[in-house]
Amino acid sequence: MSESLHLTRNGPILEITLDRPKANAIDAKTSFAMGEAFLNFRDDPELRVAIITGGGEKFFSAGWDLKAAAEGEAPDADFGPGGFAGLTEIFDLDKPVIAAVNGYAFGGGFELALAADFIVCAENASFALPEAKLGIVPDSGGVLRLPKLLPPAIVNEMVMTGRRMSAEEALRWGIVNRVVSQSELMESARELAQQLVNSAPLAIAALKEIYRATSEMPVEEGYRYIRSGVLKHYPSVLHSEDALEGPQAFAEKRAPVWKGR
């Protein structure tokens, strides 16, 4: 694993800290290491939730390492099987990822956060996609994911002028889940992670699968698709041990014990 990444396991929760000099910028080597971490998280049955954050209090990540670019790393370089920053192109991840944004999330750093399922950010966090000002485009998900979250006028301004969005504005638009003080950031992210651990893993996997499959469908078509039998997790969860455990635990007034099957 790269020395720029610090991995910490807390039971079923994996914390990934990106810690590189010069604004936690990401080059191809670091991106490969991040991809390895996320793919291992995906495939580890003992892990349920991942938290990705940046080292320090100023930068979550400034995105692509422009020093590496100046030294010849191409915008379309191979950044690994998970895409840029290791997460932006993993499309079969059925476990939740929380981005704990501790500061500036610019370019690929913002795209990394957008690839997560939840964003918890510090009050000093700021978001931007300044690629057009550098002669490139935010093609690691920014130009694809942001239009699903914001009105066209706001998206156009952000991607074409690189204008920054504050943490509070991001909260108003619903891009982030929580805004907390810098000192409370990781505590808040861990609290959310524990809430996710308390939910049944198969149910969460089914929800993520349904979101991916039906997000562009009309509601009626989505209903038919869900019930067509083509999904992997949805039919399984309906007949799982966990589906029996949930109601039984509720009736017995105790916490459910999920088995993931």
UniProtKB/Swiss-Prot annotation:
Molecular function terms, GO-annotated: hydro-lyase activity; L-carnitine CoA-transferase activity
Reactions catalysed according to its record: (R)-carnitinyl-CoA = crotonobetainyl-CoA + H2O
Enzyme class: lyase
Keyword annotations of the record: Lyase
Pathway of action: Amine and polyamine metabolism; carnitine metabolism
EC number per UniProt: 4.2.1.149
One matching Pfam family: ECH_1
Active site: 111 (nucleophile), 131 (proton acceptor)
Record has Lyase as a keyword: yes
Domain of life: Bacteria
Gene3D superfamilies: 2-enoyl-CoA Hydratase, Chain A, domain 1, Lyase 2-enoyl-coa Hydratase, Chain A, domain 2
Any single biological process term in GO: fatty acid beta-oxidation
Protein role: Catalyzes the reversible dehydration of L-carnitinyl-CoA to crotonobetainyl-CoA.
Recorded family membership: Belongs to the enoyl-CoA hydratase/isomerase family.
Protein name (record): Carnitinyl-CoA dehydratase
Species this chain originates from: Salmonella typhi
Primary gene name: caiD
